[in-house]
């Protein structure tokens, strides 16, 4: 069981972390929604305990294990991961607003 202060700090941390990563990737790659597309893949790597090669060698077992782990996530874990997705989406919105107002990043 995760305590409430840890959940609150984790929510803020994931939001700020993925906002920052998304903002930097958006500036460098000039693709506004790159982090919002990459984030679900990052979440699957965070949730999964399988190695990447196991998804190629034995996909049935690996994806079944991943599906089971996704379904067994606690509400706090889902809330933390959703806050990271919100940070990635807000970074895309922020970079679009800055570009529309004439700011050129790199």
Curated annotation (Swiss-Prot):
- Which subcellular locations apply to this protein? Cell membrane
Supply the Pfam families for this chain. YuiB
User: What is the protein's major site of localization?
Assistant: membrane
Membrane disposition: Multi-pass membrane protein
| Membrane-spanning intervals of the chain | 4-24, 27-47, 78-98
Q: Which key words are in the record?
A: Cell membrane, Membrane, Transmembrane, Transmembrane helix
The reply to whether Membrane figures as a keyword in the UniProt entry is: yes
> Which domain of life, per UniProt?
Bacteria
Q: Which GO terms describe its cellular component?
A: plasma membrane
Question: What name goes with this protein?
Answer: Uncharacterized membrane protein YuiB
Lineage, please? Answer: Bacteria, Bacillati, Bacillota, Bacilli, Bacillales
What gene is behind this protein?
Answer: yuiB
């Amino acid at each position: 069981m995760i305590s409430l202060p840890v959940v609150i700090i984790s929510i803020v941390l994931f939001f700020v972390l993925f906002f920052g990563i998304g903002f930097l990737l958006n500036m460098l790659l000039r693709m506004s929604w790159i982090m919002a597309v990459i984030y679900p893949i990052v979440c699957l790597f965070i949730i999964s305990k399988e190695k990447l090669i196991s998804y190629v060698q034995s996909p049935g077992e690996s994806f079944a294990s991943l599906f089971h782990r996704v379904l067994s996530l606690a509400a706090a874990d889902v809330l933390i991961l959703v806050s990271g997705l919100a940070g990635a989406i807000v970074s895309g919105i922020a970079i679009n607003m800055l570009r529309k107002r004439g700011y050129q990043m790199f």
